Structures are given as C-alpha cells and as structure tokens.
Amino acid sequence: MVQLNQNFIDTITQELPAHLSMDEFIAACDRPLRRSIRVNTLKISSDDFKTLMQPKGWTFDPIPWCEDGFWISYDEEEQLGNALEHIQGLFYIQEASSMLPPTALFTPSAFTTSAKWQCVLDLASAPGSKTTQMAALMQNQGLLVANEYSASRVKVLHANVLRMGASHCALTHFDGRVFGEYLYESFDAVLIDAPCGGEGTVRKDVDALKHWSLDDVLAISETQKALIESAFLALKPGGSLVYSTCTLNRLENQGVCEYLKQVYGDAVQFESLSDLFDGAERATTAEGFLHVWPQIYDSEGFFVAKLTKTASVPRLQPEPKLQKNFPFTPASAKQAQGIKDYFQQDLGISLPDELIMVRDDEFWLFPHEFNAFIGRMRFQRIGIKLADSSKHGFKVRHEAIIALAGKQLSPTAKTVDVSDVEAKEYLMGRDIPLATADKAQGEVIVCYGGAPLGMAKHLGNKLKNNLPRDLVKDKVLLLPEQTKSL
C-alpha cells in the first residue's frame, strides 16, 4: 500500500486541476507501473526490434509521445536488465513519462536551420536514459555534453552511454550551477531534468512521500532556480530549453519557470506543448507546460516546460581563463590515414568524418564541435577511444566496435554471427567453440541479431574471447521463444 503523507495530500489537493479527482489520483498512485522500454535506434529500428522480440512473447503498446517507446508485456519474471538484448544495448528500460523531455526538446519545428542543434547540453544526466534518447534523436551527430554532479552516478552514466553506442558525447562532473559562466551562451539546446522531490515516482517507490515536508520542497526549489538560471545563461540566443521534474507541486515546477521569467523578462518565451502528441492537451497548463498527473496517461507523474531564449542576456561574472595542458593533440595526416586504413581494411568500418585525436599511444574520435570547448572546462570523457597503437600496429578498443560496427560496417567486414546461446557464453567471458574448423582469421567482430557484441580472435577452431574483463557478466538472461501466440 502506498504511503501518502497527509501534509502532501493537503497541499496537492489545492493544486489538482478541477477536472481531476483526488480519489483517482490516490488510486493511480497505488497501481504498479506498466513496464516500458525505448528501442535504441542507434543500433536497431523499432520495427526490427519488434520482429526480434515478438516470437519471445513480447507485446508492444506504443507510447504516444515517443516514436520508439513502448509499454510491453511478456511472460517472464526475470529482471529485464539481465536480458541479452538489453546488455547488447538494443533497448533501454525507461519509464514512459521520462521520454517526454527529449521529445519536447527535439520537436520537428526545432530543426529550422542546418546550423541548429550542433551543441546540446544535458545538465543532470545520470543514469543516462534521456542522454541516450537525445543521442539517438541526434543520430550521433554534433556534440552532446552530458553532466552529472554525483561521482558514483558518472560511472553509471558512462556505462550506459557506451552500452547504447553514443559516440558524440562529452561527459562532465560538475555542479550544474557553474555552466552558465564557464560555457556562457554556448549551446543550441539545453535539457535540465532537475533534481526534485520525486512526488511522481510513488508508483515504483511506495515510501517516496512518507516523509514529505513543505520545508524540503522550498529548499530544493531554490536549487532548481539556480540550475535553470545557469542553464539559461549557457543557452545561445534563439536556443531552446526544456525544464522537467518527476514531481508534482507547483513550487518545483511552474514556480521555477516563473522565477526565470521574472528575472529575465521578455528574453524568456514559454512555448506551448499542447500539440506535442495526440492527447497532450489533457495535461497542458494555462502556460503551455505539461503537468502529467499519474491518472491521466497511467504513468509516473511528471512536469515538462519548454522555453525559447529570445535575446542575449548579460553574464553574471567575468569570463573564466582558459585551462591549459589539454592532454590531446590532433592526429597528423599520416596518423589519421593510418587509423582510418586499419578500421577500413582490417575491420570493415568506415570512420565518421570527425576529429581524430591522440593522447600518448591512444587514438580517439571527437566530434568536430568539441574544438570550441577545449580549455573552457574539464571533461571526464570525450567521444570514443578508437584504438591503442604499438610497433606492431593498432589494437581496436571495445567501445569503438560497439559504437561504430553497426551502421558503419561494410559488406567485407570480418564478422561472425553467433546464436543466442553463444552470445550468452561470449558475454559471460567464455571462448566460443566453432562447429567446423576453418583457417584462422585473426580479429573478428562477434555479432548477434545484426548488432555487435565485441571482438574475438578467430583461431580456426574457436573464437578467443576479447571482451574487457570489467564488462563480463555473471548472468545473462535468454528470453525463450513462445510456442503459442499471445
């Protein structure tokens, strides 16, 4: 049974829209959430994913605000996070409401000029659901800066970015309040899914509201105001900003947006989201925001606001000095050609036309747009590591294969397709015996379902596992095919 604090009920009763009832709200909070996932179109199309999973008993109910999002049902009690297809990065387990903010930011009308959307900021990124959703919407083009304040959550963010094959991200680890000054008016679009009271999450955490207090709400709303102001300062004139939370009270939602409007006046233009998807008007406020109560779409509670920065605003502090000793240098023409030839000739992968950078014996691929950010802030991770070099040549890195060996593969690529059982063995760090002995082929890309799992060394009679030890799994779930239609 859900635990609803009486102080919360008293407060939210005054804010609930007239067309909704408190009884329906409480009943919705007491129901378990529907399972929902988002297909990772960086690796597989939604149609192909459904074709892959329907024989395993999955049914798909489209989420109206996300083209690649689905409520799912299937006959398995196991944790989906252990599923082979999840480990492979074909889908992300993501609550339906949390797919709203990236959709709101990347509306078709946003793409008005080819110059827009080259630099995007996700101010509070972990664990990475919205970051990787935006990476897919950007099709790994441009630069996506993903920031996370919590050190432990940066590791989770990085793991999800790599698993999903997002190659154009730069990760940072800062308090989001510094971005307005360090990267003043640098981004075409900014998403801030702000830390909040989490009132909308009660359907998956029955104790989320047990200790609710107005004092806590007031305190966190002050942090949110500082974060949205920092995000607004980091936004270019003409750019779009989406502010979202998974909470329900006005202080953390409309109140934060109204604060920004009070400070910056006509430079802040609220954009209506009433036409974002069919049925959006059911959750649209007078300001044009989406205030999603859990009973409206049978989802988590959520809030989404979109605004345009119509004019430049003064920065609050002098521009910081550029930082020195950036550890990467551009590859020479000879080095760049060498790494391109290795990927093309040995692996069958055409490298994207991006910056090839060198650090010691490491070769990296950076988005072109990152040039404008060198020295302005310290980055935890940039782009993807392509390979290590030695006197014997190059050694490809796992993350490069995961990010680039999908749509970039040529017909001549050295790949070995494995069964689901063999894929499970591979992900558990084991070598794969080959049914028929053949001539040794050296480095090969191991694939399952048309998407890469990683590298192996073809020794003729087996595939020697080259999966990095830190990625070896203790458990991999194979979802069984169903013998009856569902």
From Swiss-Prot:
Does S-adenosyl-L-methionine appear among the keywords? yes
Q: What class of enzyme is it?
A: transferase
- Mind telling me which Gene3D superfamilies this protein's record contains? 3.10.450.720, Vaccinia Virus protein VP39
Q: Where does S-adenosyl-L-methionine bind?
A: A124, S125, A126, P127, G128, S129, K130, E148, D175, D193
**SUPFAM superfamilies registered for this protein in UniProt:** S-adenosyl-L-methionine-dependent methyltransferases
Sorted alphabetically, which InterPro entries does this protein's record hold?
Methyltr_RsmF_N (IPR031341), MeTrfase_RsmB-F_NOP2_cat (IPR049560), MeTrfase_RsmB-F_NOP2_dom (IPR001678), Nol1_Nop2_Fmu_2 (IPR027391), Nop2p (IPR011023), RCMT (IPR023267), rRNA_ssu_MeTfrase_F (IPR023545), SAM-dependent_MTases_sf (IPR029063)
**One matching Pfam family:** Methyltr_RsmF_N
**Active site per the UniProt annotation:** C246 (nucleophile)
The task this protein performs is described as: Specifically methylates the cytosine at position 1407 (m5C1407) of 16S rRNA.
What HAMAP family does its record include?
16SrRNA_methyltr_F
State what protein this is by name: Ribosomal RNA small subunit methyltransferase F
